[in-house]
Amino acid sequence: MDSHQEYVLREVAQKNIRFIRLWFTDVAGVLKSISIDPGELEEAFAEGIGFDGSAVEGLTRVYESDMLLKPDASTFQLLPWRSNEDPVARMFCDVLMPDGRPAPSDPRGVLERVVKRAADAGFRVMIHPEIEFYLLRQPVTPDRMIPVDQAGYFDHVARGDSNDFRRRAVRMLEDMAIPVEFSHHEGGPGQNEIDLRAVDPVRAADNIMTARTLIEEVALREELVATFMPKPFIEHPGSGMHTHLSLFEGEENAFFSPAGQYRLSTTGRQFIAGLLAHAEEIAAITNQHVNSYKRLWGGGEAPSYVCWGHLNRSALVRVPLYKPKKAAAARIEYRAPDPSANPYLAFAVLIAAGLDGIEKKMELMPEAEDNVWDLSDRERQVMGIHALPASLSDAVRAMKSSDLVAATLGEQVFDYVIRNKRKEWTEYRHQITRQELEQFLKVVPR
């Protein structure tokens, strides 16, 4: 038994914790949870807790359903939205096969494999995500979506519900050892953003799953609804999950070069080139729903075209401003992902794409200095700028032919995502929308 496991057993006994929740996700990124009694902890650490994997989306087939949950004791935290009188704790889990091998379909395991591949190449990856979401007043229905305020970007709303909400959410996140860089009101009414500090990729994905759950829990307790839907309003900005990435070789930031353009190293340029080369192929993972493409093609600074730029928020990849004496903070920002993505899979394909650029020494295309949305199709063509997929169907088609995504996800996850996303697109394509009825449901003129 390691020191983390011993710590968990002591904490559970000293604080009289009666319920321990074991968390993991399905392939779609939906959080799953099973509660165990403290008496089961030692067995869980030693052997894992059995469950029916075939009942969880994408994990396994019905004829090989037995799987194990192995708690990661380093993720042990109390749930701050639960009563102190009846404390509840949680740990994230790795999913194992009955013989103890990592389950190939476990999203957390997919990311762990890519992180190991980066480490084998000499790199330590750090990820800093921005999480955007809308706060709506209850009750919420498709016909009734009322934002909690009418504020805009960076607005301070005196005694505003968003201010109070963010303050409570940030305090709870930090109580769970999830470091927050900053929080603020975003561009849409009732839209907020909480930025988490850079940590290793697996912890970053764990933190996103925790943050989404915590934000939803805090909202419900305040008689609000938090939605991470990429584009809930036609007339307002969509919600993204801009993802900042950096690589370290030892203690040195591999993206930093004092002599490079924008202080960006050759390694950093190759990493960006890899992201751009595979952007269309990975879109079905970073932007996994039909609604995701209404954000990407709906304006509001969402990226629609495959290019990079310095400080250019119309670009897919942005190189943020370099601050003097801040070499360790050198990073790139990939702006396509949205908060409905499975963060484990999204981070896995982003890292894999960037590493491919480094391994193949890809050349980076010229920088896009203009607002890409204002350029004509001809101008973009001359600059070598092509579009991201316009729909989930286009994204799945691009992913289907991707050797990189197939190798990164593994056969089982890859095949499941293709099937599941095709099903989602087919169901959407068969819908008759209100707009169609309003436009076409009329008596044919005589």
State where each predicted segment sits:
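Glycine-rich, acidic/polar active-site loops that bind/position phosphate-bearing ligands
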Residues: 1-446
